[in-house]
Regions:
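Bacterial Sec-dependent signal peptides at the C-terminal "C-region" and cleavage site
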Residues: 20-31
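Sec-exported extracytoplasmic/periplasmic mature domains
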Residues: 68-76, 132-135, 155-159, 210-218, ...
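Juxtacatalytic substrate-recognition/specificity segment
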Residues: 32-138, 142
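N-terminal secretory signal peptides that target proteins for export/translocation
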Residues: 1-6
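Soluble non-cytosolic domains of exported or imported proteins
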Residues: 53-65, 116-121, 125, 140, ...
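Acidic/His/Gly-enriched intrinsically disordered linker/tail segments
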Residues: 141-210, 215-217, 223, 228, ...
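Beta/coil-rich, acidic/histidine-enriched accessory regions frequently appended to metallopeptidases
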Residues: 235-337
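Bacterial N-terminal signal peptides
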Residues: 10-22
Length: 337
Protein backbone atom coordinates (compact mmCIF):
# COMPACT_ATOMS: atom_id res chain seq x y z
CA UNK A 1 0.00 0.00 0.00
CA UNK A 2 2.85 2.35 0.82
CA UNK A 3 4.59 1.60 -2.46
CA UNK A 4 1.48 2.51 -4.46
CA UNK A 5 1.11 5.74 -2.53
CA UNK A 6 4.72 6.76 -2.92
CA UNK A 7 4.79 6.04 -6.64
CA UNK A 8 2.81 9.21 -7.27
CA UNK A 9 5.55 11.36 -5.86
CA UNK A 10 8.67 9.28 -6.47
CA UNK A 11 11.53 11.00 -4.74
CA UNK A 12 14.50 11.86 -6.90
CA UNK A 13 17.73 13.10 -5.39
CA UNK A 14 19.43 15.78 -7.44
CA UNK A 15 22.65 17.21 -6.08
CA UNK A 16 23.65 20.59 -7.41
CA UNK A 17 27.03 22.20 -6.87
CA UNK A 18 26.46 25.91 -6.31
CA UNK A 19 28.89 28.79 -6.04
CA UNK A 20 28.39 31.31 -3.25
CA UNK A 21 28.40 34.95 -4.21
CA UNK A 22 30.01 37.79 -2.35
CA UNK A 23 27.94 40.57 -0.89
CA UNK A 24 28.71 44.04 0.40
CA UNK A 25 29.40 42.62 3.84
CA UNK A 26 32.07 40.22 2.57
CA UNK A 27 32.31 36.63 1.35
CA UNK A 28 29.96 34.04 2.81
CA UNK A 29 31.31 31.16 4.89
CA UNK A 30 31.90 27.89 2.99
CA UNK A 31 28.72 25.83 2.67
CA UNK A 32 27.61 22.56 1.09
CA UNK A 33 24.41 22.93 -0.94
CA UNK A 34 22.27 20.19 -2.51
CA UNK A 35 18.71 19.95 -3.79
CA UNK A 36 16.12 17.23 -3.24
CA UNK A 37 13.25 16.98 -5.69
CA UNK A 38 10.13 15.49 -4.06
CA UNK A 39 7.39 15.15 -6.65
CA UNK A 40 6.91 18.74 -7.82
CA UNK A 41 8.64 20.23 -4.78
CA UNK A 42 12.24 21.33 -4.28
CA UNK A 43 14.13 21.16 -0.98
CA UNK A 44 17.36 23.16 -1.03
CA UNK A 45 19.65 21.72 1.63
CA UNK A 46 22.46 23.96 2.87
CA UNK A 47 25.01 22.72 5.39
CA UNK A 48 26.89 25.47 7.20
CA UNK A 49 30.63 25.11 7.52
CA UNK A 50 31.60 23.06 10.55
CA UNK A 51 32.78 19.65 11.70
CA UNK A 52 30.41 16.71 11.20
CA UNK A 53 31.22 13.02 11.51
CA UNK A 54 28.58 11.95 8.99
CA UNK A 55 29.17 12.33 5.23
CA UNK A 56 27.00 14.34 2.89
CA UNK A 57 25.24 11.16 1.76
CA UNK A 58 23.84 10.62 5.24
CA UNK A 59 22.65 14.23 5.52
CA UNK A 60 20.77 13.96 2.24
CA UNK A 61 19.30 10.59 3.28
CA UNK A 62 18.13 12.18 6.54
CA UNK A 63 16.36 14.98 4.69
CA UNK A 64 14.97 12.50 2.18
CA UNK A 65 13.56 10.23 4.89
CA UNK A 66 11.82 13.16 6.59
CA UNK A 67 10.38 14.45 3.31
CA UNK A 68 9.28 10.93 2.35
CA UNK A 69 7.47 10.56 5.68
CA UNK A 70 5.62 13.86 5.35
CA UNK A 71 4.66 13.17 1.73
CA UNK A 72 3.39 9.70 2.65
CA UNK A 73 0.97 11.22 5.17
CA UNK A 74 -0.22 14.23 3.19
CA UNK A 75 -0.14 12.64 -0.28
CA UNK A 76 2.44 15.17 -1.45
CA UNK A 77 5.07 17.45 -0.02
CA UNK A 78 3.29 20.49 1.50
CA UNK A 79 4.98 23.39 -0.32
CA UNK A 80 6.56 23.84 -3.78
CA UNK A 81 9.88 24.97 -2.35
CA UNK A 82 11.56 24.99 1.05
CA UNK A 83 15.07 25.90 2.16
CA UNK A 84 16.62 23.64 4.79
CA UNK A 85 19.64 24.99 6.67
CA UNK A 86 21.67 22.50 8.73
CA UNK A 87 23.85 24.18 11.36
CA UNK A 88 26.63 22.07 12.92
CA UNK A 89 27.38 22.47 16.62
CA UNK A 90 29.78 20.75 19.01
CA UNK A 91 28.07 17.77 20.57
CA UNK A 92 25.55 15.09 19.70
CA UNK A 93 22.01 14.99 18.40
CA UNK A 94 19.51 17.17 16.57
CA UNK A 95 18.39 20.38 18.27
CA UNK A 96 16.70 23.74 17.90
CA UNK A 97 14.56 23.04 14.84
CA UNK A 98 12.50 26.02 13.68
CA UNK A 99 10.19 26.45 10.68
CA UNK A 100 9.13 29.72 9.06
CA UNK A 101 6.75 30.73 6.27
CA UNK A 102 9.19 33.21 4.73
CA UNK A 103 10.47 32.71 1.18
CA UNK A 104 7.93 29.97 0.58
CA UNK A 105 9.19 27.94 3.55
CA UNK A 106 12.41 27.91 5.56
CA UNK A 107 13.66 25.38 8.14
CA UNK A 108 16.78 25.70 10.24
CA UNK A 109 18.00 22.89 12.45
CA UNK A 110 21.11 22.16 14.51
CA UNK A 111 23.14 18.97 14.10
CA UNK A 112 25.79 17.82 16.57
CA UNK A 113 29.28 17.13 15.30
CA UNK A 114 29.32 13.68 16.95
CA UNK A 115 25.94 12.55 15.60
CA UNK A 116 26.04 9.11 13.95
CA UNK A 117 24.25 7.78 10.88
CA UNK A 118 22.05 5.62 13.11
CA UNK A 119 21.03 8.62 15.21
CA UNK A 120 20.14 10.58 12.08
CA UNK A 121 17.86 7.87 10.77
CA UNK A 122 16.12 7.60 14.16
CA UNK A 123 15.61 11.36 14.39
CA UNK A 124 12.09 12.74 14.72
CA UNK A 125 12.76 16.48 14.78
CA UNK A 126 13.24 17.15 11.06
CA UNK A 127 10.00 15.32 10.24
CA UNK A 128 8.26 17.37 12.97
CA UNK A 129 9.53 20.60 11.41
CA UNK A 130 8.50 19.62 7.88
CA UNK A 131 4.97 18.85 9.09
CA UNK A 132 4.68 22.50 10.16
CA UNK A 133 4.79 23.37 6.45
CA UNK A 134 1.40 21.67 5.94
CA UNK A 135 -0.71 23.91 8.19
CA UNK A 136 -1.54 27.61 7.84
CA UNK A 137 -0.07 30.17 10.22
CA UNK A 138 -2.55 31.04 12.97
CA UNK A 139 -2.66 33.57 15.82
CA UNK A 140 -0.23 33.11 18.71
CA UNK A 141 -2.88 31.90 21.14
CA UNK A 142 -3.43 28.91 18.85
CA UNK A 143 0.22 27.86 18.71
CA UNK A 144 -0.82 24.64 20.46
CA UNK A 145 -2.56 23.40 17.29
CA UNK A 146 0.58 23.95 15.19
CA UNK A 147 2.80 22.09 17.65
CA UNK A 148 0.14 19.54 18.48
CA UNK A 149 -0.31 18.49 14.86
CA UNK A 150 3.44 18.12 14.33
CA UNK A 151 3.84 16.21 17.60
CA UNK A 152 1.00 13.78 16.86
CA UNK A 153 1.45 13.32 13.11
CA UNK A 154 5.25 12.93 13.15
CA UNK A 155 5.42 9.31 14.38
CA UNK A 156 2.43 8.30 12.24
CA UNK A 157 4.08 9.75 9.15
CA UNK A 158 7.33 7.94 9.94
CA UNK A 159 5.46 4.66 10.38
CA UNK A 160 3.65 5.18 7.06
CA UNK A 161 7.04 5.58 5.35
CA UNK A 162 8.50 2.56 7.21
CA UNK A 163 10.93 4.65 9.25
CA UNK A 164 9.46 3.74 12.65
CA UNK A 165 7.74 0.79 14.29
CA UNK A 166 4.10 1.01 15.36
CA UNK A 167 4.83 -0.40 18.81
CA UNK A 168 7.40 2.32 19.48
CA UNK A 169 4.89 5.05 18.67
CA UNK A 170 2.27 3.72 21.08
CA UNK A 171 4.87 3.21 23.82
CA UNK A 172 5.97 6.82 23.38
CA UNK A 173 2.38 8.10 23.46
CA UNK A 174 1.57 6.15 26.62
CA UNK A 175 4.61 7.79 28.23
CA UNK A 176 4.12 11.32 26.89
CA UNK A 177 0.39 11.98 26.33
CA UNK A 178 -0.28 12.56 30.06
CA UNK A 179 1.98 15.63 29.82
CA UNK A 180 -0.81 17.27 27.81
CA UNK A 181 -3.52 16.89 30.46
CA UNK A 182 -4.68 20.11 32.19
CA UNK A 183 -3.27 20.86 35.63
CA UNK A 184 -4.52 23.09 38.44
CA UNK A 185 -5.26 26.60 37.19
CA UNK A 186 -5.56 25.55 33.54
CA UNK A 187 -7.79 27.82 31.44
CA UNK A 188 -8.01 25.81 28.23
CA UNK A 189 -5.73 25.38 25.23
CA UNK A 190 -6.04 28.96 23.97
CA UNK A 191 -5.22 30.44 27.38
CA UNK A 192 -2.64 28.06 28.87
CA UNK A 193 0.71 28.32 27.15
CA UNK A 194 2.88 25.90 29.11
CA UNK A 195 5.22 23.55 27.27
CA UNK A 196 3.12 20.50 28.17
CA UNK A 197 -0.17 22.01 27.05
CA UNK A 198 1.31 23.53 23.89
CA UNK A 199 2.97 20.37 22.57
CA UNK A 200 1.22 17.47 24.27
CA UNK A 201 -2.07 19.23 24.93
CA UNK A 202 -2.20 19.93 21.21
CA UNK A 203 -1.25 16.32 20.45
CA UNK A 204 -3.95 15.11 22.84
CA UNK A 205 -6.50 17.23 20.96
CA UNK A 206 -5.39 15.67 17.66
CA UNK A 207 -5.43 12.12 19.04
CA UNK A 208 -8.89 12.54 20.55
CA UNK A 209 -10.15 14.05 17.29
CA UNK A 210 -8.62 11.28 15.17
CA UNK A 211 -10.32 8.52 17.15
CA UNK A 212 -13.66 10.36 17.23
CA UNK A 213 -13.65 11.13 13.49
CA UNK A 214 -12.98 7.47 12.78
CA UNK A 215 -15.70 6.38 15.22
CA UNK A 216 -18.30 8.69 13.67
CA UNK A 217 -17.43 7.73 10.07
CA UNK A 218 -17.15 3.97 10.71
CA UNK A 219 -13.40 4.29 10.17
CA UNK A 220 -13.80 5.69 6.65
CA UNK A 221 -12.21 9.06 7.54
CA UNK A 222 -9.64 10.27 10.05
CA UNK A 223 -7.52 13.24 11.04
CA UNK A 224 -5.34 12.57 8.00
CA UNK A 225 -8.30 13.36 5.72
CA UNK A 226 -9.02 16.52 7.70
CA UNK A 227 -5.45 17.78 7.44
CA UNK A 228 -5.22 16.89 3.75
CA UNK A 229 -8.41 18.89 3.27
CA UNK A 230 -6.74 21.97 4.76
CA UNK A 231 -3.63 21.54 2.63
CA UNK A 232 -5.64 20.93 -0.54
CA UNK A 233 -7.58 24.15 0.14
CA UNK A 234 -4.30 26.09 0.08
CA UNK A 235 -3.69 26.10 3.82
CA UNK A 236 0.07 25.81 4.22
CA UNK A 237 2.54 27.71 6.39
CA UNK A 238 2.82 30.61 3.93
CA UNK A 239 -0.86 31.48 4.46
CA UNK A 240 -2.42 33.27 7.45
CA UNK A 241 -5.74 31.74 8.45
CA UNK A 242 -8.17 32.02 11.33
CA UNK A 243 -8.16 28.76 13.26
CA UNK A 244 -11.93 28.53 13.00
CA UNK A 245 -11.60 28.60 9.20
CA UNK A 246 -9.01 25.81 9.23
CA UNK A 247 -11.16 23.63 11.47
CA UNK A 248 -14.25 24.24 9.32
CA UNK A 249 -12.36 23.23 6.16
CA UNK A 250 -11.02 20.17 7.97
CA UNK A 251 -14.47 19.15 9.16
CA UNK A 252 -15.86 19.50 5.65
CA UNK A 253 -13.23 17.03 4.45
CA UNK A 254 -14.48 14.40 6.91
CA UNK A 255 -18.19 15.19 6.79
CA UNK A 256 -18.25 15.74 10.56
CA UNK A 257 -18.01 18.62 13.03
CA UNK A 258 -15.56 16.83 15.33
CA UNK A 259 -12.72 19.35 15.21
CA UNK A 260 -14.93 22.41 15.67
CA UNK A 261 -16.86 20.75 18.49
CA UNK A 262 -13.71 19.61 20.27
CA UNK A 263 -12.15 23.06 19.93
CA UNK A 264 -15.24 24.68 21.44
CA UNK A 265 -14.96 22.30 24.39
CA UNK A 266 -11.22 22.71 24.99
CA UNK A 267 -10.35 26.26 23.94
CA UNK A 268 -11.16 28.13 27.15
CA UNK A 269 -11.64 25.52 29.87
CA UNK A 270 -9.71 22.47 31.08
CA UNK A 271 -10.88 19.16 29.62
CA UNK A 272 -9.16 15.93 30.59
CA UNK A 273 -9.09 12.86 28.35
CA UNK A 274 -9.49 9.39 29.87
CA UNK A 275 -6.34 7.96 28.35
CA UNK A 276 -6.54 4.63 30.18
CA UNK A 277 -9.94 3.99 28.62
CA UNK A 278 -8.63 5.11 25.21
CA UNK A 279 -5.74 2.64 25.37
CA UNK A 280 -8.11 -0.15 26.46
CA UNK A 281 -10.60 0.49 23.65
CA UNK A 282 -7.82 0.67 21.05
CA UNK A 283 -6.17 -2.50 22.32
CA UNK A 284 -2.91 -0.96 23.54
CA UNK A 285 -1.46 -2.62 26.64
CA UNK A 286 1.70 -1.61 28.49
CA UNK A 287 3.27 -4.25 30.75
CA UNK A 288 5.93 -1.97 32.21
CA UNK A 289 8.56 -2.74 29.61
CA UNK A 290 6.82 -3.22 26.26
CA UNK A 291 3.61 -2.50 24.37
CA UNK A 292 1.27 -5.28 23.30
CA UNK A 293 -1.35 -4.62 20.61
CA UNK A 294 -4.60 -6.57 20.93
CA UNK A 295 -6.60 -7.12 17.77
CA UNK A 296 -9.67 -8.26 19.72
CA UNK A 297 -10.17 -4.80 21.28
CA UNK A 298 -13.36 -2.86 20.37
CA UNK A 299 -11.46 -0.17 18.44
CA UNK A 300 -8.51 -2.22 17.20
CA UNK A 301 -9.49 -1.43 13.60
CA UNK A 302 -9.27 2.29 14.39
CA UNK A 303 -5.82 1.80 15.91
CA UNK A 304 -4.63 -0.02 12.81
CA UNK A 305 -6.12 2.62 10.51
CA UNK A 306 -4.37 5.46 12.36
CA UNK A 307 -0.91 4.06 11.70
CA UNK A 308 -1.68 2.37 8.39
CA UNK A 309 -0.01 -0.83 9.64
CA UNK A 310 3.24 -0.08 7.79
CA UNK A 311 6.05 -2.63 7.70
CA UNK A 312 8.76 -2.48 10.41
CA UNK A 313 11.46 0.16 10.09
CA UNK A 314 15.09 -0.67 9.47
CA UNK A 315 15.82 -1.91 5.99
CA UNK A 316 14.13 1.03 4.27
CA UNK A 317 16.12 3.53 6.30
CA UNK A 318 19.35 1.85 5.25
CA UNK A 319 18.12 1.80 1.65
CA UNK A 320 17.52 5.56 1.79
CA UNK A 321 21.13 6.13 2.81
CA UNK A 322 22.42 3.81 0.11
CA UNK A 323 20.24 5.48 -2.54
CA UNK A 324 21.50 8.92 -1.57
CA UNK A 325 25.08 7.68 -1.43
CA UNK A 326 24.83 6.33 -4.95
CA UNK A 327 23.44 9.63 -6.24
CA UNK A 328 26.20 11.57 -4.53
CA UNK A 329 28.81 9.32 -6.06
CA UNK A 330 27.49 10.26 -9.49
CA UNK A 331 26.75 13.95 -8.91
CA UNK A 332 28.90 15.06 -5.99
CA UNK A 333 28.17 18.43 -4.44
CA UNK A 334 31.07 20.57 -3.26
CA UNK A 335 31.69 23.43 -0.93
CA UNK A 336 31.11 26.91 -2.20
CA UNK A 337 33.88 29.36 -1.60
Amino acid sequence: MLQARLSRFQIFVVLLALLATSCSLGARAPQMTSTLIVGNSHIDVTVDDGKLNVPQADLIAWAQAAAESVASYYGRFPVPHVSLRIMPFSGHGVRHGMTFGMRGGFIKIGLGSDTTKAALMNDWMLTHEMIHLAFPSVADEHHWIEEGISTYVEPIARIRASHMKEEQMWADLIRDMPKGQPEAGDQGLDRTHTWGRTYWGGALFCFDADVEIRRQTQNKKGLQDALRGILNAGGNITEDWELTKALKVADQATGTTVLTDLYNQMKDKPVSVDLQEKWKQLGIEWDGSAVHLRDDAPQAAIRRAITGAASPAGSNADASIQSAANAIAVMAGRKSS
